[in-house]
């Protein structure tokens, strides 16, 4: 990338191009090809999908660059990769590999418990998770070009993604209704930068796209998130932890596109086989809740 391609306007525009699509987690070239053939608009290259990261425990880090390069060489669609929150070097390594987007992700073990990356220092666009408008606005102020709900990754349980999408959208409506002289107090109470809130008020929406992520496991889940206002869908473990990844991938892409066509979604949901095994959120210990990572 050149410095020109690294401007905020261009980076946000690149993320906007993925709007309405599905981004799938993959761990090798074979999975990347399945995702591309199913109609994914991009893939996320990593060593393990979130369900396996959750099961393995321990410290989870950036993927081996060999895996990232293997995926990049296998598909023509954009390739994303994850770095740990606050890990300056992992982000620079991924940028040097030529990935199309970097996800500063709570799925991996945070490297810094105080600071997120200053994403404006990079030419590559960044994706970040959020649960509310405070987190969303802080990530935007840091230079994030795309947001996604945090949900609860690797659970196959959509409830947290629904909660986060509804929360962000409700707070956007609240910001839009405030007078400008009321925004400063709102900024103080939420930790949201005032200038970003002004931009949200002026636009009536976030200035970057906001995808759904964290728990999407079925075509109906994907359609639900689109109806709640998501600009697109990330699917982590839901594809390749299902009984039939090829069928699930195609069905989720179709349901994301035609999210109000209930007869089609019913048809897409027939004969898919078992979805990934789900996890009840209330059974997770506080330290197992990935959505709590980041600030």
Curated annotation (Swiss-Prot):
Residues engaged in binding D-glyceraldehyde 3-phosphate: 166
**PROSITE patterns under this entry?**
PDXS_SNZ_1, PDXS_SNZ_2
Q: What class of enzyme is it?
A: lyase
- What pathway is this protein said to act in by its record? Cofactor biosynthesis; pyridoxal 5'-phosphate biosynthesis
Q: Which domain of life is it from?
A: Bacteria
Q: Where is the active site?
A: 82
Q: A Pfam family this protein belongs to?
A: SOR_SNZ
InterPro entries attached here? Aldolase_TIM (IPR013785), PdxS/SNZ (IPR001852), PdxS/SNZ_N (IPR033755), RibuloseP-bd_barrel (IPR011060)
Under SUPFAM superfamilies, the record lists: Ribulose-phoshate binding barrel
What is this enzyme's catalytic activity, as reactions? aldehydo-D-ribose 5-phosphate + D-glyceraldehyde 3-phosphate + L-glutamine = pyridoxal 5'-phosphate + L-glutamate + phosphate + 3 H2O + H(+)
**Chain sites annotated for binding D-ribose 5-phosphate:** 25, 154, 215, 236-237
User: Which keywords accompany this UniProt record?
Assistant: Lyase, Pyridoxal phosphate, Schiff base
Q: How does it assemble?
A: In the presence of PdxT, forms a dodecamer of heterodimers.
Question: Function, please?
Answer: Catalyzes the formation of pyridoxal 5'-phosphate from ribose 5-phosphate (RBP), glyceraldehyde 3-phosphate (G3P) and ammonia. The ammonia is provided by the PdxT subunit. Can also use ribulose 5-phosphate and dihydroxyacetone phosphate as substrates, resulting from enzyme-catalyzed isomerization of RBP and G3P, respectively.
The record ties this protein, via PANTHER family, to: PYRIDOXAL 5'-PHOSPHATE SYNTHASE SUBUNIT SNZ1-RELATED
Q: What is this protein called?
A: Pyridoxal 5'-phosphate synthase subunit PdxS
What is the organism of origin for this protein? Bacillus cereus (strain ATCC 14579 / DSM 31 / CCUG 7414 / JCM 2152 / NBRC 15305 / NCIMB 9373 / NCTC 2599 / NRRL B-3711)
